[in-house]
Amino acid sequence: IAAGLQNVGADHNLQAIAQYLMAGKKLISFNGAADPLISPRDHLRNWQTVVQLAGSAGSNARFYLEPGVGHVLGGNGPDQTDYLGAMIAWVEQGTAPGQLVLTKFDSNGNATSSLPDCPYPTVPHYSGSGSVSAAASYTCATS
């Protein structure tokens, strides 16, 4: 099994990732909630273990669970966001990422819907007014 996991890039050492965070490095991790290949629950459990192992340095990590998103991209949910820009702002300016925006584009490049990309443990909650297809109609809150 371990050899098979290595072949798909799923081999990992959670203690090594925690040490990476303890060295002051930053980590943004995400998973599509509808990912059929990588279990969002397993990914979240691994992330929680890393944060626990890292102690106070666990604040150097963020996890985003993308509603309706499949493996990396695709699925019914908005699947595009700027994690690279968020990481650059965090590393270069010290601005830790919070709520981001996920956007779905049609084949012509037009935005068709958006949702907030909420840092765990928060999730998108509809405010009760506005378009259900617009991130502005949601807030990030704990379930």
Predicted regions and their residues:
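C-terminal His-loop and adjacent cap/lid subdomain of alpha/beta-hydrolase
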Residues: 1-143
